[in-house]
Amino acid sequence: MDSYEYGELLKTLHNKCENIAKILNPTSLQKQLKDIENLEQDEHFWNDSKRAAEVAKQKRKCERMLQTYTNTKQEIDDALELYEIAMSEEDSRTLELLFEQAPSLLSHIQKVEIEVMLSGENDGSNAIITIQPGAGGTESQDWASILYRMYLRWSERRGFKVELLDYQDGEEAGIKGVAFIIKGENAYGYAKSENGVHRLVRISPFDANAKRHTSFASVQVSPELDDDINIEIEDKDIRIDTYRASGAGGQHVNKTESAIRITHFPTGIVVQCQNDRSQHKNKATAMKMLKSKLYELELQKNQEGASQEKSEIGWGHQIRSYVLAPYQQVKDLRTQFATSDTSGVLDGDIDEIIESVLVHTSAKDN
């Protein structure tokens, strides 16, 4: 790194700090804190302990967000000031030190930028993910299983826990469908970027003529809802079916009809759960999955009219293409982010892609 590159880095960091300011709005946070302090000075305020606890929680959140912005801005300002002094005094030793610290400074600011982008109401929730293969039989079913493994590996890398809810084996290979919960801090905030249709182009391992095939699979992501979020589902709007569990379920599978499938007529949403021996527990989990999907659908309608974008799996609401032949490239169609490290991506190294989507979405929103 040289002086010019470091100067350009500082400009980039300044832009990132401005992004953070747009999202956190420090002026508004300061006003909120002032209002809360005025509230706390009212002698009657503490009489309502429930309200006082809620306000205290909001105060801590505002303080934390404001501190995040202040620390970030200070870090960048300090680097700029030190750089200008070193340049004016031709202090090569200090400049070398700044250049050495540049990658970690950039990494830290990028991390802060991403974290503040995950400040949505449900971003801190666990994520319920359903993967469904598109048309094409074995090809797309195998592609669905590759995506499932990719998310398992990604979860491992991030230290998230995974709980399997439903698993349907494919006829020859792969899976007919899978549903699982990723549990961890900001799991939904990160995973929501994966919502959409994923396209694979490769030389088929199932084709004796070694022809190139295109396969599709849909990934649906919704937040695991707290019990206090009330979503009413009328009995007349759903059908509940029982069936024997199959696939990766353990010794009890196929012995009793403990698996549950719920069909929601107004939306056409179908959810399945077979992860427990108890039909009652599977039904409760399936209802939770349905509520989460209905909630996510409503969010999408409000935010971007996504109800218009839903289409059959194929060339519809496609978000990403994975080309393994004749060349190797994974490309996100929303951000145009591309990488030739297809094996790394399919092994769960997708943070860079996810972060590019979060930055893109946040910048668009602001």
From Swiss-Prot:
GO terms for molecular function: translation release factor activity, codon specific. Gene3D superfamilies: 3.30.160.20, 3.30.70.1660, Release factor. Methylated by PrmC. Methylation increases the termination efficiency of RF2. It comes from the Bacteria. The modification N5-methylglutamine is found at residue 251. InterPro entries: PCRF, Pep_chain_release_fac_I, Pep_chain_release_fac_I_sf, PrfB. Its main location: cytoplasm. It is found in: Cytoplasm. GO terms for cellular component: cytoplasm. Keywords: Cytoplasm, Methylation, Protein biosynthesis. SMART domains: PCRF. Pfam families: PCRF (PF03462), RF-1 (PF00472). HAMAP family: Rel_fac_2. Peptide chain release factor 2 directs the termination of translation in response to the peptide chain termination codons UGA and UAA. NCBIfam families: prfB. PANTHER family: CLASS I PEPTIDE CHAIN RELEASE FACTOR (PTHR43116:SF3), PEPTIDE CHAIN RELEASE FACTOR 2 (PTHR43116). Belongs to the prokaryotic/mitochondrial release factor family. This is Peptide chain release factor 2. It comes from Helicobacter hepaticus (strain ATCC 51449 / 3B1). The lineage of its organism: Bacteria, Pseudomonadati, Campylobacterota, Epsilonproteobacteria, Campylobacterales. The gene is prfB.
